[in-house]
Amino acid sequence: MKMRLVAAAAMGLAMSTTIAATATTDATTSAPGTSLTTDTEKLSYSIGADLGKNFKKQGIEISPAAMAKGLQDGMSGGQLLLTDDQMKDVLNKFQKDLMMKRSAEFNKKAEENKSKGEAFLNENKSKEGVVSLPSGLQYNILERGDGAKPTKDDVVTVEYTGKLIDGQVFDSTEKTGKPATFKVSQVIPGWTEALQLMPAGSTWEVYIPSNLAYGPRSVGGPIGPNETLIFKIHLISVKKSDA
């Protein structure tokens, strides 16, 4: 996660080199006003706007005037205000500081998610129909099935919807329009534990603490570190292992 963020920032900085390599306008050409008439002006503006949006999104503070000056000086081939070694030191410090900042933000988010998840599960366990297991897994039987229960080596076919504790849906078989099929042991631990308790034909709502989901790592999208997850699972069928 940290490396991706640092790489993204470094890529943004590297794009200034791309500007110098691709733009053909003379370095002394005055900046356009509100009108962009040539392809070069449109390209230059697009690259600048894209960089600006990315810097803002990542919380990176820069001086647009100093950046424009550096771009102009680099393209002119004249004397630069900093030596190559000085610029290298500046960029290395920037990456180090950014990594530390992102790491602190990530750890803070992980602690917040963990606390919110624990509070949710603590309240949820007292709700009618909710069963709490020693592992921390919770479930509520919405529809009882009478089929076979799978083992960890069996293959199951399911329909499901996954959401965060705030109700945000992050995945669902409804998106693909078809059920999912996989081996019971090849999913997150909370799923593996719950599925082995479910008779085929059942529909359960399963509440999975972060340590039985993706833990402190972030898997991208809306699932952050230490997220408690909720799944509505309909176990359609079980294919017994040949082993």
UniProtKB/Swiss-Prot annotation:
Coiled coil ranges: none
Q: How is its activity regulated?
A: Strongly inhibited by FK506 but is completely resistant to cyclosporin A.
Catalytic activities: [protein]-peptidylproline (omega=180) = [protein]-peptidylproline (omega=0)
One cellular-component annotation, GO: cell outer membrane
Pfam families the UniProt entry points to? FKBP_C, FKBP_N
Q: Does the keyword Isomerase apply?
A: yes
Q: Which residues are the signal sequence here?
A: 1-20
Q: Keywords in UniProt for this one?
A: Cell outer membrane, Isomerase, Membrane, Rotamase, Signal, Virulence
Chief localization = membrane
- Please list the residue ranges annotated as the PPIase FKBP-type domain: 153-243
The GO annotation for biological process reads:
protein folding
The places in or outside the cell where this protein is found are: Cell outer membrane
UniProt family annotation: Belongs to the FKBP-type PPIase family.
- Main role? Essential virulence factor associated with macrophage infectivity. Exhibits PPIase activity.
By what name is this protein known?
Outer membrane protein MIP
The species this protein belongs to is: Legionella micdadei
Lineage of source species: Bacteria, Pseudomonadati, Pseudomonadota, Gammaproteobacteria, Legionellales
